[in-house]
From Swiss-Prot:
Top-level enzyme category: transferase
Catalytic activity: (S)-2,3,4,5-tetrahydrodipicolinate + succinyl-CoA + H2O = (S)-2-succinylamino-6-oxoheptanedioate + CoA
This protein's encoding gene: dapD
Pathway stated in the Swiss-Prot or TrEMBL entry: Amino-acid biosynthesis; L-lysine biosynthesis via DAP pathway; LL-2,6-diaminopimelate from (S)-tetrahydrodipicolinate (succinylase route): step 1/3
An individual GO BP term: lysine biosynthetic process via diaminopimelate
GO-annotated cellular components: cytoplasm
Main localization category: cytoplasm
Superkingdom of origin organism: Bacteria
Lineage: Bacteria, Pseudomonadati, Pseudomonadota, Betaproteobacteria, Burkholderiales
Alphabetized NCBIfam families for the sequence: dapD, PRK11830.1
Key words, A-Z: Acyltransferase, Amino-acid biosynthesis, Cytoplasm, Diaminopimelate biosynthesis, Lysine biosynthesis, Repeat, Transferase
Entry's localization field: Cytoplasm
Organism: Ralstonia pickettii (strain 12J)
Record's protein name: 2,3,4,5-tetrahydropyridine-2,6-dicarboxylate N-succinyltransferase
Amino acid sequence: MTQQLQSLIDQAWEDRANLSPKSAPADVREAVANVIGQLDRGALRVAEKQDGEWIVNQWIKKAVLLSFRLEDNAPMAAGGFTQFYDKVPSKFANYTAEDFAAGGFRVVPPAVARRGSFIAKNAVLMPSYVNIGAYVDEGTMVDTWATVGSCAQIGKNVHLSGGVGIGGVLEPLQANPVIIEDNCFIGARSEVVEGVIVEENSVISMGVYLGQSTKIYDRETGEVSYGRIPAGSVVVAGNLPSKDGSHSLYCAVIVKKVDAKTRAKVGLNELLRGD
């Protein structure tokens, strides 16, 4: 079944310029709706870790993108106090008390999650935004005004602090989603975008900006890397001087690395303040 779905989605993607809400064939509509439904239930994921490496299921991402071509905007009620006008309904639009109880997560008003996102048990959505295709795993806190972008993958027991921005793949179009692995802490107002991977047990301080072009400087080794924060890293915002010393440019600095036991025992402030 999955292979048939993938083949149909791939074919539709090649013909996407000719698709519209009025012209799309029924089998394409059904295939895309099937994928979005499975994403919503957590049965499919845009990215999965296999043998220690993250594999992006590009065909699922294509289905998410195709879904926008297949729907017209429509009015959407919001708690009786306003309306919205969009293509993607709320994940919780038709939820009953029993559905919320079965889901096992908390949703604090006015948090928004779009249909096609997955929220696992014991997750908490403070007034925040989770976009289509995103995966928020067990025990994760999405704090106030944090944004989880389309198709982003958030691990278990992650804390996305207030105002954190996790980039998506839709606007601008990105090849791979942002991935935040298990037990990470992302400090307030930090941004992780453009498919950057933050590996497990890492701590990102407040106001750190990570994209594919951001230099990541390891203070211990002096090495500069891009696009990935190694497991157990403690990262703060910093600057690196230019070769001629005339100016400096922003970078992210790995000030230390800690193992999971240290991460569990030591307070966040102590990790960030320590030399």
